[in-house]
């Protein structure tokens, strides 16, 4: 043995240099060399160890060491091995295979694996780790005081209560100084653009999922899609908005420190939170007061509410705040020792138009029995329009890659006569703009957060600002890069950061690019400033990527591609001083990826997977239990039980992917007429009886499920209204459950087949930019203005596309109520049950909207969202046999049965509802006319929505239906093509079938007249 090795034989063999012997190996004596050769012969079949993963890079054994004294074999893998998820079961499998290949003398040796200088066990996330966890990746779950705690919400100890999460969705609209224009950072493809496409996932699904599990979520971009904005401030307020100051027993005074002041336009270097002042009060047991912020709301709708306060040394952590909205009153407790001098999100609430202090205000109350300082600055309602103006600076820095490795210094390019350029606003809603501009509006310091390039390149500023914003939220010792202990920041303890992107790239056929995860573990000796190991970022990346791939494979595509986990110094991965993942979910350029990516169900599944990954990561890091929150309840029904008493019932939904996602309770929310919902009533039962207060008032209800992990999204919204003068009520059956992607073609043409089916968004689609126009798969990318296959128009940018809001019972019910009838409602699943009692109803109103058979999750051969399912047919047959009347409306009430070759449903529609399908795409104008035969019974004309409307979905392919059987006759035709649009039947019962959705008639007066005519026809007068 050579001196220094003692009893350890080091045998090195570098597979990727087969012609070059390692120096240590070449220095071995002949006996040692023979031993080395025998050992390598034993493990040479290791090329099969990474079968199935080699597409992620070269993976093999780099070297081997044998410790004879301790009877241990150490195997060193090539660096790319850590691109794959590491688990104990996989390592044990590798050891088993290798041990079986070793000759007898090594069979009893232990085997250890290493990669990049670490034991392979170090790459197992804490959640999956068996043994003593790495303390440098752990974090105590301290009893934090939340930033803004909603008093009405329960605590979720096995969820995300008291966790703070910072995230951002992709890029955003930005100012390109070189071209002197505002533009997207990516190309418009397949009807969307990456700059706002991930925003759909976060805004619709991920952010509310995290918040409903108890987390406080911080966004670097504006979250609210409301284009109106109202500011109430002590300096200046919008319109007739007002700040009412009540000193009480104390005195509100203007602080000598700077605060917010509204400005219509922000120019470089301007900070709105240093442009004004704020109010404060020294609170004692004797001194107390209130501040009431009363906005003048320009139009009714949903508005995000933001509040702000100043920085005070003796700030209180329990400041009461009350939001009065159209649904009632919601109370908060504010921790003013953090989050000062910026916008703090309270929630999104419904407000009626105008000034209404009782139903539209925010009140700050000084807490009782407290000593300290309460401060208050501006309150903001709504997201608004972008107000940051840009023009070229005196010089321009070229774009830099986000990846730090290999970067060279950029050369400044002088821009002559820059003062001749005019300042330009984006002209877009603020939510569409890049985070750089929102961060300026939110009071972040420019030089260390959002303008690291001296206003000379907004593109670089934007991606660099995202991580520095996270650091500024936290402050020392985790402050912005290079500031060390100098910057106090906002004192918010952020637990993780998450960057949501999609990638580019194409593949042939139906193969997908798939999901990539990026983290950074190497900078600063692999440690965050607070002493946490940067391997925590790998844990987070592994947990989220693994969950996404697993759930997508089970629900959508069994061979969804899991790409690598890259350990690279991308700005968004390395800058945040907290565990961070940069996600590249799929390729927005690849047709096969976007076929799934445009599906709202896919978006929900991905967002839920991300939430689950985060929840498990944080629970493991904090050493506590995790429970996944339930899915929304279904099988909802309202029933009149006695007088004004209404029974609300529902059923829990089992999550096939999550055994812990079981409800332990429910919240029932109520809305009165067209106001917002209240804060809900908690119950552990699956039904609740309430007594409504007023007749001829519409009461709407929705239910969410809860457990210790969080609260689900609510299920559908049903409604009831009672009329003292009405006999048997109308039963509204909500059969419109569908959400679906647009049709997709991949043959001679490739892309979104919007002419066939534009799909149904979940509530809303804010990511649509315009229709695709390039369907040639061979078209190359030349420039973002000429991106090839998938290229799309820009005419719909900023327009929110309405989808299925699961609340169309209200629209139908409003017309029924105004016609003088009582009504009650149930889901179609409840109506389809064999024991459903159909006798107490005068008529059934079947809502089918854009319901249409769509491939189901988990079983793509089966179709969900079918019209006239067997159970519905059976109960309709029973109902009409007793003389009951039926209204059925929907765009596919004939098409669905025909395209699914459902001869039973076709026959039922003809025999009992007395219509037969003639054509789909019967019209594209939205205009209807009454037939001569029906002119004495129905209104002469009306319109449905066949184009864009901000409040109702587009009906792109209504059905043409013809009368079937004696007693049936046409009542409406589509004006343009004269195709039959509606059919009525008069016999032992009466029915009306409409080939367009009733709720798609946008004019309330026309809807009311149509419903009144139908119900009068049912009366048989």
Regions found by a protein language model. Name each.
Residues 850-957, 968, 975, 1006, ...:
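A glycine-rich, often tryptophan-bearing local segment used as a flexible ligand/cofactor-contacting loop or short
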Residues 289-313:
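A short beta-strand element within beta-rich, extracytoplasmic domains
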Residues 406-421, 432-534, 538, 566-589:
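Active-site microenvironments of hydrolase-like enzyme catalytic domains
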Residues 270, 358-361, 367, 378, ...:
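Active-site-adjacent mobile loop/cap segments within catalytic or ligand-binding domains
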Residues 690-710:
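Beta-strand-rich modules
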Residues 190-194, 201-214, 221-222, 716-842, ...:
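Aromatic-Pro/Gly-enriched surface loop or interdomain linker
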Residues 730-736, 743-756, 799, 835-900, ...:
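Short alpha-beta junction capping motif
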Residues 617-660, 710-728:
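Pro/Thr/Ser/Gly-rich low-complexity, intrinsically disordered linker/stalk tracts
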């Amino acid at each position: 043995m050579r001196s220094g090795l003692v009893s350890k034989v080091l045998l090195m063999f570098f597979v990727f240099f087969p012609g070059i012997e390692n120096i240590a190996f070449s220095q071995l004596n002949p006996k040692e060399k023979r031993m080395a050769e025998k050992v390598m012969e034993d493990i040479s079949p290791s090329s099969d160890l990474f079968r199935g993963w080699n597409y992620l890079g070269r993976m093999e054994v780099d070297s081997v060491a044998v410790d004879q004294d301790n009877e241990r074999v150490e195997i060193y893998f090539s660096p790319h091995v850590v691109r794959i998820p590491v688990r104990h079961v996989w390592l044990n499998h590798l050891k088993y295979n290798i041990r079986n290949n070793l000759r007898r003398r090594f069979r009893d040796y232990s085997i250890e694996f290493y990669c990049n200088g670490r034991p392979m066990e170090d790459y197992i996330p804490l959640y999956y780790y068996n043994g003593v966890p790495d303390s440098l990746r752990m974090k105590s779950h301290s009893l934090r005081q939340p930033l803004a705690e909603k008093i009405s919400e329960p605590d979720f100890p096995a969820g995300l209560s008291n966790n703070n999460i910072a995230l951002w969705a992709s890029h955003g609209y930005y100012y390109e100084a070189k071209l002197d224009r505002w533009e997207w950072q990516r190309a418009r493809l397949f009807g969307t653009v990456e700059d706002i496409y991930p925003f759909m996932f976060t805004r619709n699904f991920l952010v509310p999922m995290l918040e409903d599990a108890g987390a406080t979520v911080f966004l670097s971009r504006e979250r609210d899609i409301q284009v109106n904005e109202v500011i109430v401030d002590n300096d200046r307020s919008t319109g007739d908005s007002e700040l009412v100051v009540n000193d009480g027993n104390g005195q509100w005074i203007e602080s000598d420190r700077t605060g917010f002041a509204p400005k219509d336009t922000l120019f470089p270097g301007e900070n709105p939170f240093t442009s004004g002042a704020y109010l404060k009060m020294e609170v004692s047991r004797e001194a107390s007061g209130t501040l009431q912020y009363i906005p003048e709301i320009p139009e009714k709708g949903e508005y995000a509410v933001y509040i702000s306060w100043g920085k005070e040394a003796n700030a209180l952590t329990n400041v009461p705040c009350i939001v009065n909205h159209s649904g009632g009153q919601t109370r908060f407790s504010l921790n003013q020792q953090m989050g000062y001098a910026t916008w703090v999100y309270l929630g999104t609430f419904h407000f009626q138009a105008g000034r209404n202090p009782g139903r539209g205000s925010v009140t700050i109350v000084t807490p009782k029995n407290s000593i300290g300082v309460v401060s208050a600055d501006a309150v903001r309602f709504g997201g608004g329009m972008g107000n940051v103006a840009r023009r070229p600076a005196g010089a321009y820095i070229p774009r830099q890659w986000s990846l730090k490795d290999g970067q060279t210094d950029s050369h400044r390019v002088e821009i002559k006569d820059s003062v001749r350029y005019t300042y330009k606003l984006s002209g877009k809603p603020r939510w569409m703009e890049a985070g750089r501009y929102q961060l300026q509006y939110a009071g972040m310091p420019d030089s260390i957060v959002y303008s690291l390039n001296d206003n000379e390149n907004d593109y670089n500023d934007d991606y660099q600002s995202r991580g520095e914003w996270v650091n500024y939220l936290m402050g020392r010792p985790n402050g912005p890069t290079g500031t060390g202990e100098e910057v106090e920041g906002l004192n918010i303890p952020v637990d993780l950061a998450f960057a949501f992107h999609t990638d580019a790239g194409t593949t042939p056929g139906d193969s997908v690019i798939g999901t990539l995860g990026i983290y950074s573990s190497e900078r600063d000796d692999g440690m965050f400033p607070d002493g946490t190991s940067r391997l925590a970022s790998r844990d987070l990346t592994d947990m989220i990527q693994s969950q996404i791939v697993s759930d997508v494979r089970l629900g959508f595509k069994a061979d969804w591609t899991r790409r690598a986990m890259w350990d690279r110094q991308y700005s968004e991965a390395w800058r945040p001083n907290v565990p961070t993942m940069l996600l590249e979910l799929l390729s927005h350029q690849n047709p096969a990826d976007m076929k799934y990516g445009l599906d709202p169900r896919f978006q929900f599944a991905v967002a839920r997977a991300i939430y689950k990954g985060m929840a498990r990561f944080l629970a493991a890091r904090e050493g506590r239990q995790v429970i996944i929150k339930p899915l929304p309840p279904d099988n909802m029904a309202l029933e009149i039980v006695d007088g004004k008493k209404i029974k609300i019932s529902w059923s829990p939904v089992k999550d096939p992917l999550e055994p812990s996602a079981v409800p332990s309770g429910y919240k029932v929310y109520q809305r009165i007429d067209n106001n917002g919902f209240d804060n809900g009533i908690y119950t552990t039962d699956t039904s609740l009886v309430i007594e409504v207060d007023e007749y001829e008032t519409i009461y709407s209800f929705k239910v969410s499920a809860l457990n210790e992990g969080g609260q689900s999204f609510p299920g559908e919204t049903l409604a009831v209204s009672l009329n003292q003068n009405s006999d048997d009520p109308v039963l509204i059956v909500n059969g419109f459950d569908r959400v679906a992607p647009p049709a997709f073609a991949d043959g001679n043409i490739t892309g979104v087949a919007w002419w066939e089916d534009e799909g149904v968004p979940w509530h809303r689609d804010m990511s649509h930019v315009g229709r695709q126009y390039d369907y040639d798969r061979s078209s190359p990318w030349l420039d973002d203005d000429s991106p090839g296959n998938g290229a799309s128009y820009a005419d719909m940018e900023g327009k929110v596309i309405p989808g299925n809001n699961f609340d169309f019972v209200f629209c139908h019910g409003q017309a029924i109520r105004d016609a003088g009838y009582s009504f009650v409602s149930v889901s179609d699943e409840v109506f389809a049950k064999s024991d459903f009692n159909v006798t107490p109803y005068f008529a059934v109103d079947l809502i089918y909207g854009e319901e249409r058979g769509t491939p189901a999750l988990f079983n793509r051969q089966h179709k969900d969202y079918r019209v006239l399912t067997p159970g519905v047919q059976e109960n309709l047959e029973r109902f009409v046999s007793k003389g009951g009347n039926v209204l059925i409306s929907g765009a596919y009430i004939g098409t669905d049965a025909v395209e699914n070759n459902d001869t039973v449903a076709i026959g039922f529609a003809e025999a009992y509802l007395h219509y037969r399908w003639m054509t789909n795409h019967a019209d594209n104008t939205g205009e209807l006319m009454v037939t001569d035969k029906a002119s004495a019974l129905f209104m002469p004309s009306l319109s449905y929505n066949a184009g864009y409307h901000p409040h109702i979905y587009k009906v792109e392919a209504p059905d043409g239906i013809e009368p079937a059987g004696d007693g049936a006759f046409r009542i409406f035709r589509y004006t343009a093509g004269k195709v039959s649009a509606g059919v009525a039947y008069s016999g032992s019962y009466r029915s009306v079938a409409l080939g367009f959705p009733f709720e798609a008639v946008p004019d309330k007066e026309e809807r009311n007249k149509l419903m009144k005519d139908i119900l009068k026809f049912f009366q048989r007068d």
